[in-house]
Amino acid sequence: MKRVAVLRGGPSEEYAVSMLSGSAVLKALRESDYPHKDIVITKKGEWLEEGFVRSPEKALEAVDVVFIALHGSYGEDGQVQRILQRKGVPFTGSRALSSAIAFNKELAKNTMRPHGLLMPKHRRIHRNELDRLDEEIPNIFKEVGKELFIKPLSNGSSLGARHVPNEAVLKESLLELLDTYEQVLVEEFIRGKEATVGVMNNFRDQSVYVLPVIEIIPPNGESMFSHEHKYNGQTEEIVPGRFSYHEKAKLSAAAALAHKVIACEHYSRSDFIVRDGEVYFLEINTLPGLTSESLFPKAAAAVGLNYTDLISHLIEIAHVQNR
């Protein structure tokens, strides 16, 4: 059987989520009898194997496939993918360039724009614009919309994301986010139903297989699927989502299109808002979460693919496609 190294942890804010994803993957590998090793990347970026610091070259010795269970910067932005590509080691998920495009939310939008998908209007704000923030805030509302949503330009798990109903909240939120992040994305807030759609390669004789649409309902009527809601078990996630036939068809087609245009490999998950029968593309994730609370495994389970078999499938297609 393939010898698998699981990469988890990492220097991003999503260290804890990555550790959970990696732990779930390791459990699946034990159940499938894959020979494996657990490589934890510390918050400082050191690679640890059995508690000892190793160079990537040493840690990857005698490995057939790397399962990337990292999230956020370093894991999803193409950095670790570049390391693995240089070493010639097969790995799960998209290659470095596609990962970098998807991780930068504006770059992903601009890549998708010529392909006809609807998207919320947006504007990127850089930290160096802080000195003229007061004069720019009214312009932001005029350009983007009366109600806004802001998030870091490059991040995952909804970290830092928030709903902005007015100018006072926008200024406060921008000051807070730009203190941590160099750039943020200000988007038009579209009130509608949240949906997410997973895509997988080479499953059931389909080169691009679209999983059932998931409808996401945040608790207590809140306006967004926050980082806290993703992992506290309070959000209602309905598989398949309660969308019309035409809405589901649009969502599935849009997710498959994003997967192809960004040149994702093995698996991805795209997020959308549905309003009045129209589908708005928000972003694409090249390394969807794989914890017990994560959406991608739930969608796979809805078509009869259990977690252990999902992990095995990703390993096998990674080994074949990257040889």
Predicted regions span which residues?
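Hydrophobic beta-strand scaffold residues
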Residues: 36, 90-91, 119, 148, ...
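ATP-binding N-terminal substructure of ATP-dependent carboxylate-amine bond-forming enzymes
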Residues: 1-107, 114, 126-139, 316-323
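Active-site nucleotide/adenylate-binding loops and adjacent lid/helix of ATP-dependent enzymes
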Residues: 1-8, 101-193, 204
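Phosphate-binding site of ATP-dependent enzymes
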Residues: 165-250, 279-280
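ATP-dependent carboxylate activation and anion-phosphoryl transfer catalytic cores
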Residues: 2, 116, 244-323
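Short beta-strand-to-turn element immediately C-terminal to the catalytic PLP-Schiff-base lysine
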Residues: 125, 161-166, 199-202, 275, ...
